[in-house]
């Protein structure tokens, strides 16, 4: 092989090694790891294993079975998220088992009014029973707009779980 061919082959080998050694593009997981904690997300599946630690080697303590249920991320470690449910249950899940879709769950107690407008003096369009999961659309002050079963309206922030007290939701 002549010197030109050796130089070209050598240069290609160096480029290949550099390409392998360089970090790849940022992934969704990398971006997720940079989001603030605590934050709310929802379950991505109707079967989510809740583990005692951040890894498959840790035992499953609970199995969550309600897709779209809101959970709060309270810690993160690599590709694992420590979550808390509305009843205070905590455990670790793989990051792909939660989604950015925002939902809320209606707090326990009596049924709660759903208002037509972001004003408690506006007409009540529905009443939400405890445990109902609704999609979170936006929050303004003490009221949040939610949607469930094709009914949309505003609920008191204190009547739902799945949004931080001072959080702005577009």
Feature-to-residue mapping (PLM):
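N-terminal secretory signal peptides that target proteins for export/translocation
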Residues: 1-5
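SH3-family beta-barrel domains
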Residues: 26-52, 63-67, 74-89, 93-118, ...
């Amino acid at each position: 092989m002549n010197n030109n061919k050796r130089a070209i082959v050598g240069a290609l080998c160096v480029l290949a090694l550099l390409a392998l050694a360089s970090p790849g593009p940022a992934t969704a997981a990398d971006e997720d790891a940079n989001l603030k904690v605590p934050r709310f997300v929802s379950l991505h599946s109707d079967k989510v294993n809740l583990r005692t630690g951040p890894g498959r080697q840790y035992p499953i303590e609970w199995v969550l079975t309600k897709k779209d249920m809101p959970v709060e991320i309270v810690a993160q470690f690599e590709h694992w998220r420590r979550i808390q449910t509305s009843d205070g249950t905590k455990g670790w899940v793989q990051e792909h088992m939660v989604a950015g879709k925002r939902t809320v769950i209606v707090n326990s107690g009596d049924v709660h009014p759903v208002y037509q407008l972001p004003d408690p003096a506006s007409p009540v369009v529905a009443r939400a029973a405890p445990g109902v999961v609704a999609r979170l659309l936006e929050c303004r002050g003490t009221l949040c707009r939610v949607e469930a079963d094709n009914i949309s309206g505003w609920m008191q922030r204190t009547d739902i779980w799945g949004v931080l007290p001072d959080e702005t939701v577009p």
